[in-house]
Amino acid sequence: MGALLKLSRLIDTVNEWIGKLTMWLVLAAVIISAGNASLRKAFNIGSNASLEIQWYLFAAVFMLGVGYVMLRNAHVRIDFISSKLSKRTNAIIDAIGIVVFTIPLSIIMINLGWPVFMRAFDTGEMSQNAGGLIRWPMWALLPLGFSILLAQASSELIKRVAFITGHTSEPFSVEHGKSEAELLAEELAAEAARHEQELAAGKAR
């Protein structure tokens, strides 16, 4: 189990890096989208290539970021049910879901997506729109994204099994359900509460 947990940590580290890199694609998509809109409205200038790069970036954010979302345990779940269950029960449910749904789906989508990508790459498939972009980078995102998801699903399965069998004390490698933004918001709220208490104490004197 020790070797598997080391593999899990390696996968987590890679997906953490991919996720943070993907965040910059969101900024790039916003800048390009704003630039396209500004040029179109102000100068009546536009191109199919600039519009299609937005779609590519949008697809890349979702397909490359899917593993990071799973790492952060940020996928949608029915909180009012899972919050009432023990960590062990939740870990068992997660492990079953990963084995029955996530891993098989990822393998199927990789097998279906790879031939589509290779065909587009071999034929040099281009957009049907005038001045559009080549298509294979977009098709590559399908097998690549599900490969990332498959790797992270395997990592999560290792962690759940390790927790269930008593090899780790936590089923998650990161803090459950709290993003950096949420932690910052909690810190700011606590600081505001302290400030109000100081003001109230000052008035009491």
Residue ranges and their predicted role:
Residues 1-205:
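Alpha-helical transmembrane segments and membrane-interface helix-loop junctions
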